[in-house]
Amino acid sequence: MHPHLQTRMVEFPVEGGGTASAFEARPSGAGPCPGVILVQEWWGLNDHIKDVAQRLAGEDFVVLAPDLYRGKVTQDPNQASAWMAALDREEALRILLGALRFFQEKEPIYAEHIGVVGFCMGGSYALLLACRAPALKAAIPFYGDLPDPIDQMKTIRCPVLFIAGGKDRWINSAKVQKLKEAFHLFGVHGEVRIYPDADHAFFNDTRPDVYNPAAAQDAWTRALGLLSRMLKS
């Protein structure tokens, strides 16, 4: 852990009853900071996502990475696929909305300075959360799927930066085109950034089979730029 950061697991209430947990990372000794909800890949709340949370915290954000699988983590793609398929969409959104409310209550001065970033499965949920949470000021889905039905996007009120790789067979050119059309149709302030030589999950530096350093660095710079403009002003 970076010496100038504080990390811990926190617990928060979820609408409808019960609680959920999240990995929290924040600058040490700093006053209130804007918030970022960070949504995991299909592997679970693993060390890579915790590392990304700390990288964001190093840029003066308070980061909450909710544990959508409630403690389960895997490196097996078949297991990850099964867990993702079994995850109830509405329950996952209740957890994410609970994390959002938790931050708003803990950091009231920045209650309207919150963004969401997600990767892979988390990218899909980042876009869905933007559909459900008008309080968000920025949404940055990395190679996530589109909301189904797509007309949910008409409720998005924040800028969206959608990032994907040109070699991605899951988030393919047809889906990207559908997203662009939805941005236009529903009046969403959306930007799509495609890296032609990058594959799905190109940001994950723990996966040498797909990690693309140049694309990852450029995407990170653009993501930080949007978060800073929308959350720190």
Predicted feature residues:
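Serine-hydrolase catalytic machinery in alpha/beta-hydrolase-like enzymes
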Residues: 1-2, 9-109, 202-204
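Hydrophobic residues in well-ordered beta-strands that form the structural core
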Residues: 64-65, 141, 192
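Short beta-strand/loop motif that positions the catalytic acidic residue
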Residues: 156, 162-164, 168
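C-terminal catalytic histidine-bearing segment of alpha/beta-hydrolase fold enzymes
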Residues: 186-233
